[in-house]
Amino acid sequence: MRIAFFLLVLAVIIGFAYGYSCPKPCYGNMCCSTSPNNQYYLTDFCGSTSACGPVPSCSGALYFTADSQRFGCGKYLNLCRSGKCVKAQIYDAGPAMWVEQDAGMMIIDASPTICHVLTGGSSCGWSDHFLITATVTSLTDSRPLGPFNVTESEMAQLFIDHEIAMAQCEAEKTCNGFDLE
């Protein structure tokens, strides 16, 4: 009986430690899948190369993210946490799949400015477990890049807009690693 209990506890611990597995690996070391509930951990980055063209400067108030393999280069995301949101543009790919596996969840890599706006902190690592919601913006969204607040009904509309935008990019094969097929 003790052995069975020990094995059960061990299985639960291993399940938590290795609970995340990317449903759609791509580019050798990244995940092309999107979160079914739009929930991600927030991390920050400032790179010297970009998968989508020019490298944004890491100084100043800039609103950019990675995750082009999921959503497409140049697309816009609304990143939200506790009613506060930031509209950002996708400039790069990433993060590496091993980072998400270590975190146990999908990640949105964003500029240090976004990290500060949404958390009040100076850095965001996967072990901080800053949970955010990420949605692709509507094609008709004219909101400028940067922070904004949302009500519950506005947040619900962001989810609707996200579903429409994702259906379009999947039809056009410009997201979720469709260019690999």
Curated annotation (Swiss-Prot):
The lineage of its organism: Eukaryota, Amoebozoa, Evosea, Eumycetozoa, Dictyostelia. Has antibacterial activity against the Gram-positive bacteria B.subtilis, B.megaterium and M.luteus. No antibacterial activity detected against the Gram-positive bacterium S.aureus or against the Gram-negative bacterium E.coli. Lacks chitinase activity. Keywords: Antibiotic, Antimicrobial, Bacteriolytic enzyme, Cytoplasmic vesicle, Disulfide bond, Glycosidase, Hydrolase, Signal. The gene is alyA. Contains six disulfide bonds. It comes from Dictyostelium discoideum (Social amoeba). Residues 139-181 form a propeptide. It comes from the Eukaryota. Disruption phenotype: Mutants have only 40% of the wild-type lysozyme activity and initially form plaques on bacterial lawns that are only half the size of wild type plaques. Despite the lysozyme activity remaining constantly at 40% of wild-type, the efficiency of plaque formation gradually increases over several weeks repeated plating until the size of mutant plaques finally exceeds that of wild-type cells by almost 2-fold. It is an enzyme of class 3 (hydrolase). Residues 1-19 form the signal peptide. This is Lysozyme A. GO terms for cellular component: cytoplasmic vesicle; cytoplasmic vesicle lumen; vesicle lumen.
